[in-house]
Amino acid sequence: MAEVRLQEGEPLENALRRFKRKVQQEDIIKEVKRHSFYLKPGEKRRVKEALARKRNRKKARKEQD
């Protein structure tokens, strides 16, 4: 769990920026989105395969350059 303590004399905006960075580093947002609804095993597999195809196309495009 991301936790940021407000340091003495520190503006709230700086603490908020540190909190957002910590949340991104811990992939909390991605985890919440993943658990927001149930995916059937077949759907999970299709999503995973689609991501793999996308990744492979991107890699092939990079190698052509």
UniProtKB/Swiss-Prot annotation:
Q: Which GO terms describe its molecular function?
A: structural constituent of ribosome
Q: Identify the domain of life.
A: Bacteria
The family database entries (Gene3D superfamilies) matched by this protein are listed as: Ribosomal protein S8 (1.20.5.1150)
Record-level GO cellular component terms: ribonucleoprotein complex; ribosome
Which InterPro entries does the protein's record reference? Answer: Ribosomal_bS21 (IPR001911), Ribosomal_bS21_sf (IPR038380)
Q: What's the short name of a Pfam family annotated to this entry?
A: Ribosomal_S21
**One BP term from GO:** translation
Q: Which UniProt keywords apply?
A: Ribonucleoprotein, Ribosomal protein
Looking up NCBIfam families in the UniProt record yields: S21p (TIGR00030)
UniProt record similarity statement? Belongs to the bacterial ribosomal protein bS21 family.
What name appears for this protein in its UniProt entry? Answer: Small ribosomal subunit protein bS21
What organism, scientifically named, is this protein from?
Acidobacterium capsulatum (strain ATCC 51196 / DSM 11244 / BCRC 80197 / JCM 7670 / NBRC 15755 / NCIMB 13165 / 161)
